[in-house]
């Protein structure tokens, strides 16, 4: 049962809706025409009253408006047998199919369960008394669009904005139900008056209360319908003149849903929970009406504007987790992959689709924030230049880890190059000690003046510590005689150099004793 505050608020909103419909003589209110083609006013008006809905049939023909004639069923038997809309979507055909195929025990249950709202406004068209006595879920289904419309007008949104978010909610809620019922919409000649994005709750609740044999009968033509439905249902009709936020959001939703294949959009991967709309939604029993009437519709239909914003936040909320999962892969990926993808991923993030190119741009700006509006183009340019230069200098190495590590790519590049530099200089020192051995002999000469003469002692290796000791094992020849002779020659040369240095110091008037103390 519905709660009393919900009934009163809905009665006011419903009266507002009825007054708007009767005041528009042409019947083509742009904000309401797409609702009216999928939601019949006959089942709505007969189900939303506080009194039991016992309304006579001729009221259906009293209103001279053209929309009532447009809604009238062309051929009840044909529509009930084939379940195909003719030129426009006739909601009375849908209700007639439900009327002919409903089982009898579902009628008193639903009629007693929904007879608590205030009195019915008199200006809406009516169906037969059997149709009036029958309570389909369309009354409940029509309450949510009315609530949506009023709340969205208060919040300056448009109805198609709300319906498109509800479409994204409930489209993936029932994969089997949505697949089977979506295939039964043969919308062949209806581009002129087709709504932008019909609420899928019309399909879902009907399928919930359809008998299984009719579902199995309609399951035959399931091959050619969904692509046609996706291609044509979301085209903007020329007769619907929507306000600009509605057009923008519907275009965005159109790109979003056409980009998704029907198979992937029918999976259970919807970020919105189906329990916001239907709490016990997984049975096709008509008696399950009483279990989801009371609270979930009250919760979901009275808070539509926060529900829309929550829907958007839920839709984008898995993105940081996906970025966190794929960020490690991108941190260790080769350089050209990251740079090219970061340049290519600067597209508009609200394009929707399958979100193929989101993660590289998220990875580039993940150090700053995960918000989708922080796509700074300077960040990938900085990374491009640094990574390219590092690849020129150091081709065999993969790029540095990430800017998150605290060091820029140039720092890590210099560090990686400096390590081979140290190795090269060390090896040069080692080879210099073996190949360029005579060079230290200059510094270890007898004096600074005599060091230019010490080049002749090229076969002796002097170190920094044994300047007074001649090394014996360095001679290239292996003979002991040659070794002893060269050592003797070295001693003689050193003695001669020392004497020459002493003579030079004496001739210059220097301190000979100090020099002898150093040399000897």
Curated annotation (Swiss-Prot):
Q: Which UniProt keywords apply?
A: Activator, Conidiation, Sporulation, Transcription, Transcription regulation
Any single biological process term in GO: sporulation resulting in formation of a cellular spore
Q: Its family?
A: Belongs to the wetA family.
Against InterPro entries, the record matches this protein to: WetA
Q: Which organism is it from?
A: Penicillium rubens (strain ATCC 28089 / DSM 1075 / NRRL 1951 / Wisconsin 54-1255) (Penicillium chrysogenum)
Q: What is this protein called?
A: Developmental regulatory protein wetA
Per its database record, what is this protein's job? Answer: BrlA, abaA and wetA are pivotal regulators of conidiophore development and conidium maturation. They act individually and together to regulate their own expression and that of numerous other sporulation-specific genes. Responsible for activating a set of genes whose products make up the final two conidial wall layers or direct their assembly and though this activity is responsible for acquisition of spore dormancy.
**Which residue windows does the record flag with biased composition (Low complexity)?**
237-251, 262-295, 436-453
Q: Where is the composition biased (Polar residues)?
A: 63-72, 104-114, 155-165, 252-261, 367-401
Gene from which this protein is expressed? wetA
Residue spans of biased composition, Basic residues class: 420-429
Region feature (Disordered):
49-72, 104-165, 236-295, 367-453, 471-496
Q: What induces it?
A: Expression is regulated by the heterotrimeric G protein pga1.
């Amino acid at each position: 049962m519905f709660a009393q505050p919900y009934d009163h608020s809905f009665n006011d909103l419903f009266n507002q809706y009825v007054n708007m419909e009767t005041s528009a003589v042409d019947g083509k209110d742009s904000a309401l025409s797409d609702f009216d083609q999928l939601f019949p006013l006959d089942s709505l008006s007969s189900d939303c009253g506080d009194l039991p809905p016992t309304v006579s049939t001729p009221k259906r023909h009293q209103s001279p408006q053209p929309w009532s004639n447009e809604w009238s069923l062309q051929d009840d038997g044909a529509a009930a047998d084939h379940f195909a809309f003719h030129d426009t979507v006739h909601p009375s055909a849908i209700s007639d199919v439900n009327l002919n195929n409903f089982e009898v025990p579902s009628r008193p249950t639903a009629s007693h369960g929904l007879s608590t709202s205030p009195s019915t406004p008199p200006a809406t068209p009516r169906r037969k008394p059997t149709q009036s006595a029958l309570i389909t879920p369309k009354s409940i289904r029509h309450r949510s669009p009315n609530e949506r419309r009023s709340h969205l007008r208060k919040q300056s949104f448009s109805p198609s904005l709300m319906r498109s978010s509800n479409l994204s909610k409930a489209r993936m809620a029932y994969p089997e139900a949505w697949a089977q019922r979506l295939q039964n919409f043969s919308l062949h000649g209806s581009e002129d008056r087709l709504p932008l994005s019909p609420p899928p709750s019309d399909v879902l609740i009907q399928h919930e209360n359809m008998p299984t044999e009719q579902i199995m009968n309609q399951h035959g033509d399931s091959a050619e319908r969904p692509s046609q439905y996706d291609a044509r249902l979301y085209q903007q009709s020329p007769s619907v003149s929507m306000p600009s936020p509605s057009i923008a959001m519907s275009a965005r939703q159109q790109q979003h849903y056409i980009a998704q294949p029907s198979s992937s959009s029918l999976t259970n991967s919807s970020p919105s929970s189906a329990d916001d709309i239907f709490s016990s939604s997984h049975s096709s029993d008509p008696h399950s009406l009483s279990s989801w009437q009371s609270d979930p519709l009250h919760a979901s239909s009275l808070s539509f504007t926060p529900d829309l914003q929550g829907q958007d936040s839920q839709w984008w909320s898995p993105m940081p987790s996906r970025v966190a999962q794929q960020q490690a892969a991108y941190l260790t990926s080769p350089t050209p992959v990251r740079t090219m993808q970061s340049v290519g991923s600067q597209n508009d993030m609200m394009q929707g689709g399958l979100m193929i190119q989101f993660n590289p741009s998220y990875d580039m700006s993940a150090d700053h924030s995960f918000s989708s509006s922080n796509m700074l183009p300077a960040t990938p340019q900085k990374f491009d230049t640094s990574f390219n230069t590092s690849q020129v200098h150091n081709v065999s190495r993969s790029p540095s880890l990430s800017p998150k590590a605290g060091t820029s790519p140039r720092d890590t590049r210099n560090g990686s190059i400096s390590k081979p530099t140290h190795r090269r200089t060390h090896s040069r020192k080692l080879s210099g000690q073996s190949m360029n051995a005579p060079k230290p002999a200059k510094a270890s000469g007898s004096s600074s003046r005599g060091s230019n003469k010490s080049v002749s002692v090229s076969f002796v290796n002097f170190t920094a510590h044994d300047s007074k000791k001649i090394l014996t094992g360095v001679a290239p020849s292996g003979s002991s005689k040659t070794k002893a002779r060269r050592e003797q020659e070295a001693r003689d040369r050193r003695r001669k150099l020392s004497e020459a240095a002493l003579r030079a110091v004496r001739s210059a008037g220097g301190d000979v004793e100090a020099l002898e103390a150093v040399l000897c």
